[in-house]
Amino acid sequence: MFDKSEEYIMAKYRIAWLPGDGVGIDVMNAARIILDKIGLDAEYIHGDIGWEIWRNEANPLPDRTIKLLNETDCALFGAITSKPKQEAEAELVPKLQGKGYIYSSPIVRLRQEFNLRTNLRPCRAYPGNPLNYRDDIDIVVFRENTEDLYSGVEFHPVPDDVRRVLRASHKKMLRFDSTPNEDMAMSLRILTRQGCRNIIRDAFEYCQKYGYKSVTVVEKPNVIRETSGLMVRETRKIAKEYSGIELREANIDAMCMWLVKNPQTYSVLVTSNLFGDIVSDLCAQLVGGLGFACSGNIGDNYAVFEPTHGSAPKYAGMNKVNPIAMLLSVKMMLDWLNEGDKA
């Protein structure tokens, strides 16, 4: 994956170290204590990412950090601050303001740049945690990580040529004819067959490998018929290859209700990007909140592991934020590196 020439410290692993913003720095410090304690043979290389980099360079994920990731085995990531378009532009240093720079989430860009197509979110109740909703919850969420509304194909105002093509292609666009371009915003939900099949197969393979009994596809095909319909249809096809695993289907709204009512009856959930973002946070709260919510962004040749909480700037530097999500993310990284004994 990288040139192991003599210019590098000859550790077994080279790990990109991306603290980011706010409490991301704090929890990464906790992770380093654990990694040093277990004696992982690794070199940790700092990478610039996040809000301060955006403010000073108008790019929260600079090319030098992309280069770093291309030269390492995997990455650990802390947290980032993100703000809406206008606020982000206003916080640039003065010399960069008014030049048309647009903030985009660096973690979303990382997922797309390295095709980290699978977002894996284990949500397990650990014994003795008083914040557990129930003590018998063991849910794993598989969230497609690079498509859906997170593809970034958005318009505001909506250009005339986009409206013209859509109007000619779909009669339901006619009801918006009287709405001015500047009064309309549009985000495209894009799902590909291959993207669906990849995340679905990952979910079934995981279910089979670790002895889970069911996979539930979570979508909204009764309303979002084409995109959610594609995900559900592909799940049904792939499920036929795994005869010992029960396939369940649930609409996203009903799924949220059933997870609150009977979370212990579910094991592996598979869904698209936005719905996965929503349902995984719900599942996290069932087992103690985001302080226990680890995740892996996993592709064919690279992976980035991170807690799912935000940067919580008001707590930065105070070491008040629960580091367990970060430590569980470290465990996921060790498993991915086949360092099971250390995990």
What do these predicted regions represent?
Residues M1-I9:
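Short, Lys/Arg-enriched N-terminal segments with co-localized hydrophobic residues
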Residues M10, K67-L69, Q112-E113, P130-D135, ...:
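Solvent-exposed alpha-helices and their adjacent loops that cap or buttress functional pockets
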Residues A11-R14, L40, E71-T72, N115-R117, ...:
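Short coil/turn connectors at secondary-structure junctions
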Residues I15-I38, R164-D253:
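Glycine-rich phosphate/diphosphate-binding loop of Rossmann-like nucleotide-binding domains
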Residues D21-G24, D73, F142, A203, ...:
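Buried hydrophobic positions in well-ordered alpha/beta secondary-structure cores of metabolic enzymes
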Residues D41-I66, M257-L259:
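N-terminal beta-loop-helix "entrance" segment that forms/cooperates
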Residues R55-M173, M186, L274:
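N-terminal glycine-rich phosphate/adenylate-binding segment common to multiple enzyme folds
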Residues D63, Y101, W258-A343:
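Glycine-rich phosphate/nucleotide-binding loop
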